[in-house]
């Protein structure tokens, strides 16, 4: 009698990022080489609660996905999976319903591709017995337990290209250009892009700033004969003693325009603000993100083959390893204010707005 074909599931959850489709492709191709069947679950964890919210994925389904942005499985960062507030098992509990769905589908493993929120949900499912394996995704690069998340490199490329373009127009008109980039709680995109693009000021959540110090930098450049300035600000940056700014309930944003308005008042210069927004999430992944996503997808299937659950694949040095989901969800990977990158930037004269 032939043995039953092994089956694994894969879903994408949270905000989209370049490289999601590359992970899905690697999962399908790696599982296919083992003779396994892959079930693609639509709309993140919400797909575990619906009917007919999944489909079998074959090698034919993932042809041409490497350079393609977005996710063929769709994703959401809203829905039923908030923090579990009780250990009681209820049929109405979405987590209990999800675990039951995983069992009914006969999944040997469920590969969850997402950031900190996604892996936190995966951890709760694992506590209820689900065989989950996480894959780290976020353009913010703020997920703990891994040296790098996929999506970050592409977002960095987009932000750096924007700075390069803003340099020419800023210099032509002697303007101050403020570029707001993503980074809710961490400043990795702003810091890396600011360094790579030659910014004059970098404002990040980890280092509260004073607008007066930023204005001083603009005046200093004017005095040195450089009548334009480039300022990169993460969306979660905040003035000293202040708080994060929101453009709508639950949606960070607005700090770039606030910085621009204050600088016009303090310096009298022509200031223009550019909010990069979702351009950082869309489009084709960079070669590095394609490679990292592929390695993560293949490693997740290998973990399933070895029966390793409740863990997340991660980059450590040059190798892909697995780390406990609890470690990935325990804290955020933040920029250290005295890290080598920050010290390098300061040595180049880049201002973070905190200097006396």
Curated annotation (Swiss-Prot):
MF GO annotations: 6-phosphofructokinase activity; AMP binding; ATP binding; diphosphate-fructose-6-phosphate 1-phosphotransferase activity; fructose-6-phosphate binding; identical protein binding; metal ion binding; monosaccharide binding
Binding site for Mg(2+): 116
Subcellular location: Cytoplasm
Main location: cytoplasm
Biological processes annotated in GO: canonical glycolysis; fructose 1,6-bisphosphate metabolic process; fructose 6-phosphate metabolic process
Cofactors demanded by this protein: Mg(2+)
Reactions performed catalytically: beta-D-fructose 6-phosphate + ATP = beta-D-fructose 1,6-bisphosphate + ADP + H(+)
Binding locations of ATP: 15, 78-79, 115-118
Key words of the record: ATP-binding, Cytoplasm, Glycolysis, Kinase, Magnesium, Metal-binding, Nucleotide-binding, Transferase
InterPro entries for the chain: ATP_PFK (IPR022953), ATP_PFK_prok-type (IPR012003), Phosphofructokinase_CS (IPR015912), Phosphofructokinase_dom (IPR000023), Phosphofructokinase_III (IPR012829), PKF_sf (IPR035966)
Family membership noted in the UniProt record: Belongs to the phosphofructokinase type A (PFKA) family. Mixed-substrate PFK group III subfamily.
Protein name, entry field: ATP-dependent 6-phosphofructokinase
Protein species of origin: Chloroflexus aggregans (strain MD-66 / DSM 9485)
Gene coding for it: pfkA
